[in-house]
Swiss-Prot record:
UniProt xrefs under InterPro entries: Phosphoglycerate_kinase, Phosphoglycerate_kinase_CS, Phosphoglycerate_kinase_N, Phosphoglycerate_kinase_sf
Subunit comment: Monomer.
This protein's encoding gene: pgk
GO BP annotations, alphabetical order: gluconeogenesis; glycolytic process
Identification of the protein by name: Phosphoglycerate kinase
Cellular-component GO terms for this entry: cytosol
Taxonomic lineage from the root: Bacteria, Bacillati, Bacillota, Bacilli, Lactobacillales
Pathway listed: Carbohydrate degradation; glycolysis; pyruvate from D-glyceraldehyde 3-phosphate: step 2/5
The species this protein was found in: Lactobacillus acidophilus (strain ATCC 700396 / NCK56 / N2 / NCFM)
Length: 403
C-alpha cells in the first residue's frame, strides 16, 4: 500500500510537525558532518515554500544524565539549518511546556522552529525513558502542537518512539494526517524495490565484522538475489564453515554451523573471497601479504585480495540492481582499505543499474572516493536499512497513513 506523502497535503497555514533525523556528530558545538541536515531540506523547503509552519523534532545521541545535555543540544543544528535555508530558524531550548507552546503560537506562515533534543525526555521523570519508551502521553502532547505530522527520519524508523509512532498514533486518532517526508519516501522506494521487485541480475554485497548482524538479510535475500558477495570479518566465519584455515582472523565460532546452513541454502549464490590480504597483527603498519583462501596460523585476514576483487568486479559488471552494506576489510586502516574502495569504484561505473549503499563504512568509502553522486541511493539509516533488507516491518513507516 502506497504511503501518504507530504506533497499529497495542503500545508498552507498549517502547523506541520516533522520528525527529522538530525543525529549528527557534534564536538564542542561544531558539527562534523551535516549530511543528515541536508537530507531533510527537501521536506522542510516544501513546507515553508507552500506557506506551512515547520516544527522540527529530532533526537541527538544518547542522553543518559543531565551532564549529557550540554553536548547534546540541538542548538548548533538549528544554527546550521538557518545557514542552509538562508533564513532565520527559531531554536527552543525545551520540547515541552509553555516556552514551546508560545514559540509555536508566534509562528507565521513559512517559519521554522527547532525544538530541543527529544531524548532529553529520557531522563528526570517518573515514566523512565519517555521518548525511547514511547510514552503515549508524550506522543499525545507533541501531536497536540500540530495539524499535520510528517515522519522524515528513516534513521529511527526501526524504533517505536514517542516522536514517531507516538505522535503518528495520536494524530490519526484525532483525524489528523500522518505522512512521509521526501527522504522517507525515497528510502521506501529504493530499498522497497530492491527487496520486493529488483531488476535482475540482483547482486547483494555484504561486509562488516559479524555474520550475526546480517543473518536476517542473508536469509531474506537468498531467494531474491542472483549473487551474494561476502567480504569483511564475516567472511572468515563462512570460510571456517567450508573447512578453510583462517589463522587469527576475526570470526564467530558459535555461528559456524549457521554459516554452513546458509551456504547449503544459497547453493552457489554466496561468493566468498578466494584470496585475502593478511597481516600478523591488527595494525596499519603490520607487514602484509596476499594469501589464498587458507590463512597461515600466525596471520589474520584484514581485506579481500586482488583475485577476489577481480571476481567481484566481474560479477558486478552485469548487475542491474546492487545493494551494498558493510566494508570488505579493515577499511579504517589505509593499507587494508583497497577491497572496499575497489567495490565502491565498481558500483560507480555501473551506469545502467540501480545502486544502493547502506551502513556507515560503505557510505564513508563512497564519500572518500567522491562517488556519492554516481550512486542511485545512499541510505541514511544503518540499523533501519538492515531491518528493511531483512523484510521486517519498520514501526516508523507502518505508522504513516496509507493513501
Amino acid at each position: 500500500m502506497a504511503k501518504l506523502i507530504i506533497s499529497d497535503l495542503d500545508v498552507k497555514g498549517k502547523k506541520v510537525l516533522v520528525r527529522v533525523d538530525f543525529n549528527v556528530p557534534i564536538k564542542d558545538g561544531v558539527i562534523g558532518d551535516d549530511n543528515r541536515i541536508v537530507a531533510a531540506l527537501p521536506t522542510i523547503k516544501y513546507i515553508i515554500e507552500h506557506g506551512g509552519k515547520a516544527i522540527l523534532l529530532s533526537h541527538l545521541g544518547r542522553v543518559k544524565s543531565d551532564a549529557d545535555k550540554k553536548e547534546l543540544s540541538l542548538k548548533p543544528v538549528a544554527e546550521r539549518l538557518s545557514e542552509l535555508l538562508d533564513k532565520p530558524v527559531t531554536f527552543v531550548p525545551s520540547n515541552e511546556g509553555k516556552e514551546v507552546e508560545e514559540a509555536i503560537d508566534n509562528m507565521k506562515d513559512g517559519d521554522v522552529v527547532v525544538l530541543e533534543n527529544t531524548r532529553f525526555q529520557d531522563i528526570d521523570n517518573d515514566f523512565g525513558k519517555r521518548e525511547s519508551g514511547n510514552d503515549p502521553k508524550l506522543g499525545e502532547y507533541w501531536a497536540s502542537l500540530g495539524d499535520i505530522f510528517v515522519n522524515d527520519a528513516f534513521g529511527t524508523a526501526h524504533r517505536s518512539h514517542a516522536s514517531n509512532v507516538g505522535i503518528a498514533t495520536a494524530m490519526k486518532e484525532n483525524g489528523k494526517p500522518a505522512a512521509a517526508g521526501y527522504l522517507l519516501e525515497k528510502e521506501i522506494k529504493y530499498l522497497g524495490d530492491a527487496v520486493d521487485n529488483p531488476v535482475h541480475p540482483f547482486v547483494t554485497i555484504l561486509g562488516g565484522a559479524k555474520v550475526s548482524d546480517k543473518i536476517g538479510v542473508i536469509e531474506n535475500l537468498i531467494p531474491k538475489s542472483d549473487h551474494i558477495l561476502i567480504g569483511g570479518g564475516m567472511a572468515y566465519t563462512f570460510l571456517a564453515a567450508q573447512g578453510h584455515k583462517i589463522g587469527k582472523s576475526l570470526f564467530e565460532a558459535d555461528k559456524v554451523d549457521l554459516a554452513k546452513e546458509l551456504l547449503e541454502k544459497a547453493g552457489d549464490k554466496i561468493v566468498l573471497p578466494v584470496d585475502n590480504v593478511a597481516a600478523t597483527e591488527f595494525s596499519n603498519d603490520a607487514s602484509r601479504e596476499v594469501v589464498g583462501d587458507d590463512i597461515p596460523d600466525n596471520m589474520m585476514g584484514l581485506d579481500i585480495g586482488p583475485k577476489t576483487i577481480a571476481k567481484f568486479k566481474d560479477i558486478l559488471k552485469d548487475a542491474k540492481t546492487v545493494v551494498w552494506n558493510g566494508p570488505m576489510g579493515a577499511f579504517e586502516m589505509p593499507n587494508f582499505a583497497e577491497g572496499t574502495l575497489e567495490v565502491g569504484r565498481a558500483l560507480a561505473n555501473l551506469t545502467d543499474a540501480t545502486t544502493i549503499i547502506g551502513g556507515g563504512d560503505s557510505t564513508a568509502a563512497a564519500k572518500q572516493l567522491g562517488i556519492a553522486p554516481k550512486i542511485s541511493h545512499i541510505s541514511t539509516g544503518g540499523g533501519a536499512s538492515l531491518n528493511y533488507l531483512e523484510g521486517k516491518v519498520l514501526p516508523g513507516i507502518a505508522c504513516v497513513s496509507d493513501k
